[in-house]
Amino acid sequence: MKNETPIQGHYDTSSVFVAVIGRPNVGKSSLTNLLVGEKVAIVTSKPQTTRTRITGVITRGPLQYVLLDTPGVHKPHNKLGKRMDKTASDSIADVDVSMILFKPYGALNESEMVLVEALKKGGPAIAVINKTDLVKDPADLEARKAELKALGVFDDVYTVSVRDNDHCEELFDALSRYAVEGPHYFDDDAYTDMPEKELVAEVIREKALLYMRDEIPHGIAVVVERFKERPGTDLVDIDVNIYCERESHKGMVIGKGGAMLKKIASAARTDCEEFLGCRVNLQCWVKVKADWRDNEFMLNNFGFKQQPNR
């Protein structure tokens, strides 16, 4: 739950807002989940899994960390992609520090270089090289660190392996240096500001990404139409519409005899029951909204709106 901002004065508490940014599949959501200690962002091997900014909250005594996990910076191919890219680049503004993730190998791509240019005009930033478990020669990692330091936009460069949870804890100390005295923006026991309905929608989309192939899952939007607790029981009724862009895609999402939809819904139900702490009656329907990713009205209707950082 988000707190009301009290009047200015002396506080024994402080907060640090952190934009977590990087190219697709560099490990932003995995790192956010690891640091938060809860699953606040869905994770798959497919690029552009994260579509909107996800907030993860960690409170350690008087210091509260607010991580803004952003969509991967990439060359957009539709209006949804442009909104995703803008969400990532806009997150540099109005945060206390940007944490930019990089792979340990390969040339920096065009989107990453645009991001570096934006950092020259923005606030402080640190670089984090993830996936160090893939590095065979330590000299290669040192070369990557030197390359990033030479860009002149990072206060420091850190190396981690999210997969092995190696050196990730050190990031808390690094980020704490940018904390600002003031109130905690969230309750101390909060770990995200995402409403339960949105968490449910994200879990269903995650399962579609995991179980379906190629481009089809990226053309899917999930909208929770009903979320209602049954009085006197531990059961929640959830009705969901899964939107796709083509009639042919609808058939693939449903699958032969409804097999694919049942598989997605069953896996999603298990996850939902775990984070909601109750039984879930999940009903899913598949509908077609042609080319919704290029329709401004539908993007707004499906919840893809620009979000303030605080």
Regions inferred by a protein language model and the residue ranges of each:
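Conserved glycine(s) of the Walker
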Residues: G27, H167, M260
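Conserved G1/Walker A P-loop phosphate-binding module
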Residues: M1-V97, F102
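Catalytic P-loop NTPase motifs of RecA-like helicase/translocase cores
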Residues: T50, V73-K75, A107-L108, V135-K136, ...
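Solvent-exposed alpha-helical segments within well-ordered globular domains of core cellular machineries
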Residues: A19, N33, T52, G56, ...
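P-loop NTP-binding site
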Residues: E196-R310
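Conserved, well-folded catalytic cores of nucleic-acid-processing
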Residues: E38, V57-G61, P76, S91, ...
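Conserved C-terminal guanine-recognition region of P-loop GTPase G domains, centered on the G4
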Residues: T59-Q64, R83-V157, K228-G232
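Canonical P-loop GTPase G-domain recognition
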Residues: P124-I126, D133-E196
